[in-house]
Amino acid sequence: TTDINTDIKNQVYFNITNKCPCRCTFLIRNTEDAIGEASNLWFEHEPALEEIYKAIDEFDFSDCNEVVFCGYGEPTMALENLIAVSKYIRERYPFRIRLNTNGLSDLIHKSSTAEEICQAVDSISISLNMPDAASYNEVVRPAYGEKSF
């Protein structure tokens, strides 16, 4: 079984995809199948929206104050699901919604995605892993090369 949601310190993390346009050298996904209480964060297949809804409906959110889109893939690779799941959560719970991202959504989708992302989440954490393009490319290894920085 693969964990779609994992509870860590009053935050529920939603792992909605394993796809990512980067091959970061430092990520735990390179050495571990899971973190925290999760048993496995690698999907046998990318979860359908109905599977994510089912995981939400079956999860105990009683200690939660924030949900975070973050996992073993870049959440914006599954942008349609991210937006739909955010709406689904907002209709049911009063939680803040945060996106942890590599910031490459516009490159991934070949268009501006900021407006729809900002309507779906309350806050965004962008990984700025290195101070310059050369070291960023060496460590993050993005599919889009230097324009990723």
State what each model feature region is:
Residues 57, 72-149:
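Conserved AdoMet/S-adenosylmethionine-binding subsite of the radical SAM
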Residues 47-72:
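Short Fe-S-cluster ligation motifs
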Residues 4-48:
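Canonical Radical SAM [4Fe-4S] cluster-binding loop centered on the CxxxCxxC motif
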Residues 44-51, 81, 147-148:
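Soluble or luminal CAZymes and related metallo-dependent hydrolases
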Residues 31-37, 63-67, 132-135:
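Short, basic/glycine-rich phosphate-binding loops at helix/coil junctions
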